């Protein structure tokens, strides 16, 4: 059984021994921590203990679990710690354990007091006699780091060098000093770029009238020796640029009415019978199949053509860039035949004239 408690009154050691006693145990080990009367030549009157009780009790219970996991033969475990002011020669902490054999009991008590000092959030203040100021003391077993993270010894960490990495896979091969120098140079360059790209809101004025306007002034004050320079056609001294989007939701209102325009241009004045006689249903059916439309052969052919046109119109309205933003390639244009004048020789001309004379008697 585990006996854990934080108390404000003096600890009864006899009562603690009776709690851990058991007929099946042949050994009981107990540790009693008391207040000593001096520290580094100063007279100690008392000790004042404070604790975060909820967390302290949880940690004490975890210590008991660790003890039972390490020494399963332990029968009873007792951890009592006193809070408040503890005068000299009075018990501030009592740790006891009982087991069938002395080895487990002795080792468990030693382990418990070390863990109590290092893990449980209990703080101690020493109160001295005379004019000496009271001091809060930290346990030497505390696991909290006493040094900053910058002083971490990286040489302790072992590096697995058994796996050799090809140098072709390493992009940065500089040492720490070179990397630090590169980072500093990068910061300086970016700072210079930002300074050069910043908008100049003010113009520097000359300090006195006798200074030439071409002479630069090393010392000036932007608050008292500058004037605001506004941009042309603007009420602000900062540059304002207007963005023009050629394609997007803002341009929807400027697009033509595709359906209305296509209906007007494709209106047919030919009767249904004449069109039905001139067109082949097989070719129209192939177009409808390719466009994903279904129709009957006995349906009005004008309505079928209209459905195909509406389908093409829908595709063009979904992605109008293909029709409006691409120019026709020169490869699509038909090649023009180049006419060349034939050149005749003198002999060919004589033969040609002689032949004509024979044809015309």
From Swiss-Prot:
Pathway: Cofactor biosynthesis; molybdopterin biosynthesis. It holds the Pfam family MoaE. Its EC number is 2.8.1.12. InterPro entries: MoaE_sf, MOCS2B_euk, Mopterin_biosynth_MoaE. It is found in: Cytoplasm. GO terms for biological process: Mo-molybdopterin cofactor biosynthetic process. It catalyses: 2 [molybdopterin-synthase sulfur-carrier protein]-C-terminal-Gly-aminoethanethioate + cyclic pyranopterin phosphate + H2O = molybdopterin + 2 [molybdopterin-synthase sulfur-carrier protein]-C-terminal Gly-Gly + 2 H(+). GO terms for molecular function: molybdopterin synthase activity. GO terms for cellular component: cytosol; molybdopterin synthase complex. Keywords: Cytoplasm, Molybdenum cofactor biosynthesis, Transferase. Substrate binds at residues 101-102, 117, 124-126. It is an enzyme of class 2 (transferase). Its main location: cytoplasm. Catalytic subunit of the molybdopterin synthase complex, a complex that catalyzes the conversion of precursor Z into molybdopterin. Acts by mediating the incorporation of 2 sulfur atoms from thiocarboxylated Mocs2A into precursor Z to generate a dithiolene group. PANTHER family: MOLYBDOPTERIN SYNTHASE RELATED. Heterotetramer; composed of 2 small (Mocs2A) and 2 large (Mocs2B) subunits. Belongs to the MoaE family. MOCS2B subfamily. This protein is produced by a bicistronic gene which also produces the small subunit (Mocs2A). This is Molybdopterin synthase catalytic subunit. It comes from Drosophila pseudoobscura pseudoobscura (Fruit fly). The gene is Mocs2B.
